Amino acid sequence: MIGKLKGIVDSYGEDFVILDVNGVGYVVHCSARTLQRLPKPGEATDLAIETHVREDMIRLYGFRVDAEREWFRLLQTVQGVGTRVALGVLSVLEPAQLATAIATGDKGAVARAPGVGPRLAARLVAELKDKAPAFAPIDPALIALTGAVEDRTAPQPVADAISALVNLGYAQIQASAAIAAALKGLGEEAGTVEAKTLIRLGLRELAR
């Protein structure tokens, strides 16, 4: 079994990278998010590998961090989730974002993944909710903020800022996480901050 590959990026396909390791080109399937973050052809990189062996083929899946590989495995424990859907989920949500989305019951964030409808998103959240904290620490402030937004008890500037980021195309969990980080950075000033300032700070968090 192959657990890690280190080599030179040869070329890219729609959902894979060919990694040249000592003259041998390995086809490694990756999430869209991982492919976007790999270097250009001719540069070195390394990937954690999940190897799937079947009677007629051996397929390699690559990940930049071990947490992504662990989520890839965990997602497939849910009925209806195969490798393609698991990579789709990891294409729209980083491991920490996925853990938070599941822990907070944000089915909408999970449903943004290709191949994941509302019913499958609900099943993923329900079956993995108790396991999510073991894969990434969940920020209590983010959970509280998410609950306040859902209950419509969040301060208006906070709700407006999150809504603005969602309207810009970000997932609800991404917007909430960015605003939660911005509020934490503001400290005592968080109680008087305006929505436009939160939006600017939230976009800065999302750009990191």
From Swiss-Prot:
Has three domains with a flexible linker between the domains II and III and assumes an 'L' shape. Domain III is highly mobile and contacts RuvB. Keywords: Cytoplasm, DNA damage, DNA recombination, DNA repair, DNA-binding. GO terms for molecular function: ATP binding; four-way junction DNA binding; four-way junction helicase activity. It holds the Pfam family HHH_5. This is Holliday junction branch migration complex subunit RuvA. InterPro entries: DNA_helicase_Holl-junc_RuvA_I, NA-bd_OB-fold, RuvA, RuvA_2-like, RuvA_C, RuvA_C_sf. It comes from Methylorubrum extorquens (strain PA1). One of its GO terms (biological process) is DNA repair. The lineage of its organism: Bacteria, Pseudomonadati, Pseudomonadota, Alphaproteobacteria, Hyphomicrobiales. Coiled coil: none annotated. Homotetramer. Forms an RuvA(8)-RuvB(12)-Holliday junction (HJ) complex. HJ DNA is sandwiched between 2 RuvA tetramers; dsDNA enters through RuvA and exits via RuvB. An RuvB hexamer assembles on each DNA strand where it exits the tetramer. Each RuvB hexamer is contacted by two RuvA subunits (via domain III) on 2 adjacent RuvB subunits; this complex drives branch migration. In the full resolvosome a probable DNA-RuvA(4)-RuvB(12)-RuvC(2) complex forms which resolves the HJ. Residues 153-208 are annotated as: Domain III. The RuvA-RuvB-RuvC complex processes Holliday junction (HJ) DNA during genetic recombination and DNA repair, while the RuvA-RuvB complex plays an important role in the rescue of blocked DNA replication forks via replication fork reversal (RFR). RuvA specifically binds to HJ cruciform DNA, conferring on it an open structure. The RuvB hexamer acts as an ATP-dependent pump, pulling dsDNA into and through the RuvAB complex. HJ branch migration allows RuvC to scan DNA until it finds its consensus sequence, where it cleaves and resolves the cruciform DNA. Belongs to the RuvA family.
